[in-house]
Protein backbone atom coordinates (compact mmCIF):
# COMPACT_ATOMS: atom_id res chain seq x y z
CA UNK A 1 0.00 0.00 0.00
CA UNK A 2 1.35 3.44 -0.90
CA UNK A 3 1.94 5.86 1.93
CA UNK A 4 -0.53 8.75 2.18
CA UNK A 5 0.80 11.83 0.40
CA UNK A 6 0.03 14.29 3.19
CA UNK A 7 2.23 14.25 6.26
CA UNK A 8 1.52 15.44 9.77
CA UNK A 9 3.54 15.67 12.96
CA UNK A 10 1.95 14.97 16.33
CA UNK A 11 3.42 16.25 19.60
CA UNK A 12 2.00 14.18 22.45
CA UNK A 13 2.67 13.51 26.12
CA UNK A 14 1.35 14.27 29.58
CA UNK A 15 0.39 17.68 30.86
CA UNK A 16 3.10 20.17 31.87
CA UNK A 17 6.01 18.90 29.76
CA UNK A 18 6.23 21.70 27.17
CA UNK A 19 4.17 20.43 24.22
CA UNK A 20 2.84 23.88 23.30
CA UNK A 21 6.31 25.46 23.32
CA UNK A 22 7.70 22.69 21.13
CA UNK A 23 4.80 23.09 18.72
CA UNK A 24 5.64 26.76 18.24
CA UNK A 25 9.35 26.00 17.83
CA UNK A 26 8.80 23.29 15.23
CA UNK A 27 6.36 25.49 13.33
CA UNK A 28 8.94 28.28 13.22
CA UNK A 29 11.72 25.97 12.07
CA UNK A 30 9.74 23.87 9.60
CA UNK A 31 7.17 26.22 8.05
CA UNK A 32 4.35 24.74 10.07
CA UNK A 33 1.02 25.61 11.62
CA UNK A 34 -0.30 24.21 14.90
CA UNK A 35 -3.59 22.34 15.20
CA UNK A 36 -4.98 21.76 18.69
CA UNK A 37 -5.34 18.14 19.81
CA UNK A 38 -6.70 18.74 23.30
CA UNK A 39 -10.31 17.84 24.03
CA UNK A 40 -10.96 20.81 26.31
CA UNK A 41 -8.99 23.57 24.62
CA UNK A 42 -11.60 23.51 21.87
CA UNK A 43 -13.97 25.26 24.31
CA UNK A 44 -14.30 29.02 24.53
CA UNK A 45 -13.88 30.72 27.93
CA UNK A 46 -11.83 27.81 29.31
CA UNK A 47 -8.34 29.24 29.15
CA UNK A 48 -6.58 29.03 32.50
CA UNK A 49 -7.60 25.55 33.57
CA UNK A 50 -6.82 24.00 30.19
CA UNK A 51 -3.40 25.71 29.98
CA UNK A 52 -4.47 27.11 26.61
CA UNK A 53 -1.64 28.81 24.77
CA UNK A 54 -1.89 32.62 24.77
CA UNK A 55 -1.56 34.85 21.69
CA UNK A 56 1.80 36.08 23.02
CA UNK A 57 3.06 32.52 23.44
CA UNK A 58 2.03 31.68 19.87
CA UNK A 59 4.74 34.10 18.64
CA UNK A 60 2.88 34.69 15.41
CA UNK A 61 2.50 31.00 14.57
CA UNK A 62 -1.03 30.21 13.33
CA UNK A 63 -2.99 27.99 15.74
CA UNK A 64 -6.22 26.23 14.81
CA UNK A 65 -9.14 24.43 16.52
CA UNK A 66 -8.88 26.53 19.67
CA UNK A 67 -12.05 28.22 21.00
CA UNK A 68 -14.31 26.59 18.41
CA UNK A 69 -17.09 25.27 20.68
CA UNK A 70 -19.35 26.71 23.33
CA UNK A 71 -18.91 24.95 26.70
CA UNK A 72 -22.63 24.28 26.87
CA UNK A 73 -22.34 22.02 23.80
CA UNK A 74 -21.03 18.44 23.98
CA UNK A 75 -18.09 17.75 21.69
CA UNK A 76 -17.00 14.35 20.41
CA UNK A 77 -14.06 12.53 18.89
CA UNK A 78 -16.03 12.27 15.63
CA UNK A 79 -16.45 16.06 15.48
CA UNK A 80 -12.77 16.52 16.24
CA UNK A 81 -11.68 14.08 13.56
CA UNK A 82 -13.82 15.80 10.94
CA UNK A 83 -12.64 19.30 11.89
CA UNK A 84 -8.99 18.29 12.20
CA UNK A 85 -9.01 16.45 8.86
CA UNK A 86 -10.39 19.52 7.11
CA UNK A 87 -7.86 21.78 8.83
CA UNK A 88 -4.94 19.49 7.95
CA UNK A 89 -6.00 19.65 4.31
CA UNK A 90 -6.19 23.44 4.47
CA UNK A 91 -2.76 23.81 6.09
CA UNK A 92 -1.12 21.28 3.76
CA UNK A 93 -2.64 22.98 0.72
CA UNK A 94 -0.82 26.14 1.84
CA UNK A 95 2.42 24.12 1.68
CA UNK A 96 2.73 24.33 5.46
CA UNK A 97 3.41 21.41 7.81
CA UNK A 98 0.41 20.49 10.00
CA UNK A 99 1.60 20.03 13.60
CA UNK A 100 -0.96 18.57 15.99
CA UNK A 101 -0.31 19.32 19.65
CA UNK A 102 -2.24 17.80 22.53
CA UNK A 103 -2.66 15.21 25.21
CA UNK A 104 -6.00 13.64 24.27
CA UNK A 105 -4.77 10.29 23.02
CA UNK A 106 -7.97 8.89 21.57
CA UNK A 107 -8.68 12.09 19.63
CA UNK A 108 -5.22 11.98 18.07
CA UNK A 109 -5.24 8.25 17.43
CA UNK A 110 -8.62 8.47 15.71
CA UNK A 111 -6.99 10.87 13.29
CA UNK A 112 -3.73 8.95 12.91
CA UNK A 113 -5.46 5.63 12.22
CA UNK A 114 -8.52 7.07 10.46
CA UNK A 115 -10.73 5.18 12.89
CA UNK A 116 -14.36 4.72 11.80
CA UNK A 117 -16.53 6.93 13.99
CA UNK A 118 -20.15 7.93 14.08
CA UNK A 119 -21.39 5.02 12.00
CA UNK A 120 -24.93 3.67 11.79
CA UNK A 121 -26.69 3.99 15.13
CA UNK A 122 -27.50 0.64 16.75
CA UNK A 123 -31.05 -0.31 17.69
CA UNK A 124 -32.26 1.62 20.70
CA UNK A 125 -33.07 -1.56 22.62
CA UNK A 126 -29.45 -2.74 22.57
CA UNK A 127 -28.15 0.62 23.70
CA UNK A 128 -30.74 0.91 26.46
CA UNK A 129 -29.93 -2.56 27.74
CA UNK A 130 -26.25 -1.73 28.09
CA UNK A 131 -27.04 1.66 29.64
CA UNK A 132 -29.22 -0.04 32.26
CA UNK A 133 -26.44 -2.56 32.90
CA UNK A 134 -23.98 0.32 33.32
CA UNK A 135 -26.25 2.09 35.81
CA UNK A 136 -26.71 -1.14 37.75
CA UNK A 137 -23.17 -2.50 37.75
CA UNK A 138 -20.83 0.45 37.16
CA UNK A 139 -18.24 1.36 34.55
CA UNK A 140 -15.60 -1.17 35.69
CA UNK A 141 -18.07 -4.01 35.21
CA UNK A 142 -19.09 -2.66 31.81
CA UNK A 143 -15.48 -2.46 30.67
CA UNK A 144 -14.88 -6.03 31.87
CA UNK A 145 -17.71 -7.19 29.62
CA UNK A 146 -15.88 -5.66 26.69
CA UNK A 147 -12.53 -7.06 27.83
CA UNK A 148 -14.01 -10.57 27.89
CA UNK A 149 -15.59 -10.24 24.45
CA UNK A 150 -12.98 -8.12 22.70
CA UNK A 151 -9.66 -7.69 24.57
CA UNK A 152 -8.10 -5.70 21.73
CA UNK A 153 -10.89 -3.13 21.75
CA UNK A 154 -10.77 -2.93 25.55
CA UNK A 155 -7.08 -2.03 25.38
CA UNK A 156 -7.97 0.91 23.13
CA UNK A 157 -10.84 2.29 25.23
CA UNK A 158 -10.59 3.66 28.76
CA UNK A 159 -13.15 2.31 31.28
CA UNK A 160 -14.33 5.86 31.94
CA UNK A 161 -15.26 6.31 28.27
CA UNK A 162 -18.52 4.44 28.81
CA UNK A 163 -20.13 5.78 25.64
CA UNK A 164 -17.34 4.27 23.55
CA UNK A 165 -17.38 1.01 25.56
CA UNK A 166 -21.11 0.65 24.92
CA UNK A 167 -20.59 1.43 21.25
CA UNK A 168 -18.01 -1.38 20.96
CA UNK A 169 -20.36 -3.82 22.69
CA UNK A 170 -23.23 -2.77 20.42
CA UNK A 171 -21.20 -3.23 17.26
CA UNK A 172 -20.21 -6.71 18.40
CA UNK A 173 -23.85 -7.66 18.92
CA UNK A 174 -25.03 -6.09 15.68
CA UNK A 175 -22.42 -7.57 13.38
CA UNK A 176 -21.44 -10.77 15.14
CA UNK A 177 -17.82 -9.63 14.77
CA UNK A 178 -15.59 -8.08 17.38
CA UNK A 179 -15.37 -4.30 17.27
CA UNK A 180 -11.59 -4.58 16.81
CA UNK A 181 -12.12 -6.88 13.80
CA UNK A 182 -14.30 -4.43 11.89
CA UNK A 183 -12.82 -3.33 8.54
CA UNK A 184 -10.47 -0.41 9.10
CA UNK A 185 -10.13 2.33 6.49
CA UNK A 186 -6.65 3.22 5.30
CA UNK A 187 -4.91 6.14 7.07
CA UNK A 188 -5.44 9.51 5.44
CA UNK A 189 -2.06 10.87 6.52
CA UNK A 190 1.49 9.72 7.14
CA UNK A 191 2.22 10.59 10.78
CA UNK A 192 5.36 11.15 12.84
CA UNK A 193 4.67 11.08 16.58
CA UNK A 194 6.96 13.04 18.93
CA UNK A 195 6.44 12.35 22.63
CA UNK A 196 7.58 14.54 25.51
CA UNK A 197 8.10 13.17 29.00
CA UNK A 198 10.39 13.65 31.99
CA UNK A 199 11.28 12.03 35.29
CA UNK A 200 8.09 11.22 37.18
CA UNK A 201 9.04 13.14 40.33
CA UNK A 202 9.95 16.16 38.23
CA UNK A 203 6.72 15.85 36.26
CA UNK A 204 4.60 15.72 39.41
CA UNK A 205 6.39 18.76 40.84
CA UNK A 206 5.73 20.64 37.61
CA UNK A 207 2.07 19.64 37.70
CA UNK A 208 1.67 20.82 41.29
CA UNK A 209 3.39 24.12 40.49
CA UNK A 210 1.23 24.60 37.41
CA UNK A 211 -1.96 24.15 39.43
CA UNK A 212 -0.75 26.73 41.95
CA UNK A 213 0.02 29.11 39.08
CA UNK A 214 -3.44 28.53 37.61
CA UNK A 215 -5.07 29.42 40.91
CA UNK A 216 -2.99 32.58 41.13
CA UNK A 217 -3.93 33.44 37.55
CA UNK A 218 -7.65 33.36 38.37
CA UNK A 219 -8.87 29.81 37.76
CA UNK A 220 -11.49 30.06 40.50
CA UNK A 221 -13.00 33.16 38.90
CA UNK A 222 -12.95 31.44 35.51
CA UNK A 223 -14.93 28.49 36.87
CA UNK A 224 -17.32 30.77 38.73
CA UNK A 225 -18.01 32.73 35.53
CA UNK A 226 -18.60 29.53 33.55
CA UNK A 227 -21.13 28.27 36.08
CA UNK A 228 -23.31 31.29 35.36
CA UNK A 229 -24.20 29.83 31.96
CA UNK A 230 -22.84 26.27 31.89
CA UNK A 231 -24.44 23.45 33.94
CA UNK A 232 -22.09 21.76 36.39
CA UNK A 233 -22.81 18.42 34.73
CA UNK A 234 -21.97 19.66 31.21
CA UNK A 235 -19.24 17.76 29.39
CA UNK A 236 -16.93 20.78 29.42
CA UNK A 237 -17.21 21.10 33.20
CA UNK A 238 -15.84 17.58 33.68
CA UNK A 239 -12.38 18.86 32.79
CA UNK A 240 -9.76 18.55 35.51
CA UNK A 241 -9.39 21.90 37.23
CA UNK A 242 -13.04 22.77 36.76
CA UNK A 243 -15.10 19.96 38.26
CA UNK A 244 -13.04 19.99 41.47
CA UNK A 245 -13.82 23.65 42.20
CA UNK A 246 -17.58 23.33 41.81
CA UNK A 247 -18.14 21.96 45.35
CA UNK A 248 -16.27 24.93 46.83
CA UNK A 249 -18.32 27.41 44.81
CA UNK A 250 -21.46 25.62 46.02
CA UNK A 251 -20.31 25.89 49.63
CA UNK A 252 -19.75 22.15 49.97
CA UNK A 253 -15.96 21.91 50.36
CA UNK A 254 -12.86 23.79 51.47
CA UNK A 255 -10.81 25.49 48.77
CA UNK A 256 -7.54 23.89 49.87
CA UNK A 257 -9.10 20.43 49.57
CA UNK A 258 -10.39 21.21 46.08
CA UNK A 259 -6.98 22.44 44.93
CA UNK A 260 -5.35 19.32 46.35
CA UNK A 261 -7.82 17.25 44.33
CA UNK A 262 -6.92 19.11 41.14
CA UNK A 263 -3.27 18.26 41.72
CA UNK A 264 -4.06 14.63 42.49
CA UNK A 265 -6.32 14.20 39.49
CA UNK A 266 -3.78 15.93 37.23
CA UNK A 267 -1.02 13.58 38.37
CA UNK A 268 -3.20 10.52 37.83
CA UNK A 269 -4.22 11.80 34.41
CA UNK A 270 -0.58 12.34 33.43
CA UNK A 271 0.15 8.73 34.34
CA UNK A 272 -2.74 7.52 32.17
CA UNK A 273 -1.60 9.73 29.29
CA UNK A 274 1.90 8.25 29.38
CA UNK A 275 0.52 4.72 29.47
CA UNK A 276 -1.73 5.40 26.49
CA UNK A 277 0.91 7.01 24.30
CA UNK A 278 3.48 4.33 25.11
CA UNK A 279 1.08 1.49 24.36
CA UNK A 280 -1.05 2.86 21.54
CA UNK A 281 1.16 5.13 19.41
CA UNK A 282 4.59 4.64 17.76
CA UNK A 283 6.27 7.48 19.60
CA UNK A 284 9.77 8.99 19.51
CA UNK A 285 10.37 10.10 23.10
CA UNK A 286 12.33 13.14 24.31
CA UNK A 287 12.87 14.83 27.68
CA UNK A 288 13.11 18.56 26.99
CA UNK A 289 12.85 19.38 30.69
CA UNK A 290 16.19 17.69 31.40
CA UNK A 291 17.64 18.24 27.92
CA UNK A 292 16.16 21.37 26.30
CA UNK A 293 18.87 21.27 23.65
CA UNK A 294 17.24 18.13 22.22
CA UNK A 295 14.66 20.28 20.47
CA UNK A 296 17.21 20.66 17.68
CA UNK A 297 17.46 16.87 17.43
CA UNK A 298 13.68 16.81 17.06
CA UNK A 299 13.88 19.30 14.19
CA UNK A 300 16.48 17.08 12.50
CA UNK A 301 14.32 13.99 13.03
CA UNK A 302 11.33 15.67 11.41
CA UNK A 303 13.42 16.99 8.52
CA UNK A 304 14.80 13.53 7.79
CA UNK A 305 11.33 12.01 7.98
CA UNK A 306 9.94 14.61 5.57
CA UNK A 307 12.63 13.67 3.04
CA UNK A 308 11.63 10.01 3.08
CA UNK A 309 9.49 8.76 0.24
Swiss-Prot record:
A Pfam short name: IPPT
Disulfide bonding pattern of the chain: none
InterPro entries: Dimethylallyltransferase, IPT, P-loop_NTPase
SUPFAM superfamilies: P-loop containing nucleoside triphosphate hydrolases
Tree of life domain: Bacteria
Sites annotated Interaction with substrate tRNA: 104, 127
Family stated for the protein in its record: Belongs to the IPP transferase family.
Source organism (scientific name): Lacticaseibacillus casei (strain BL23) (Lactobacillus casei)
Residue numbers binding ATP: 13-20
The protein's role, per its UniProt record: Catalyzes the transfer of a dimethylallyl group onto the adenine at position 37 in tRNAs that read codons beginning with uridine, leading to the formation of N6-(dimethylallyl)adenosine (i(6)A).
Protein name per Swiss-Prot or TrEMBL: tRNA dimethylallyltransferase
Residues binding substrate: 15-20
Amino acid sequence: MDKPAKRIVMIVGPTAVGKSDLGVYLAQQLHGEVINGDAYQIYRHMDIGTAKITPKEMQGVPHHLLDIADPTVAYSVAKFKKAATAMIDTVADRQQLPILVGGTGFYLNSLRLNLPLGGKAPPTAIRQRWQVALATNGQSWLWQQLAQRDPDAAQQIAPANTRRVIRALEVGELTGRRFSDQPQPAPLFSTLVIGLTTDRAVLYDRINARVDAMMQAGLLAEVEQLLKTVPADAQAMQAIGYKELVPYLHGQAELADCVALIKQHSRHFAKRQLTYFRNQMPTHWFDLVAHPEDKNAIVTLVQQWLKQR
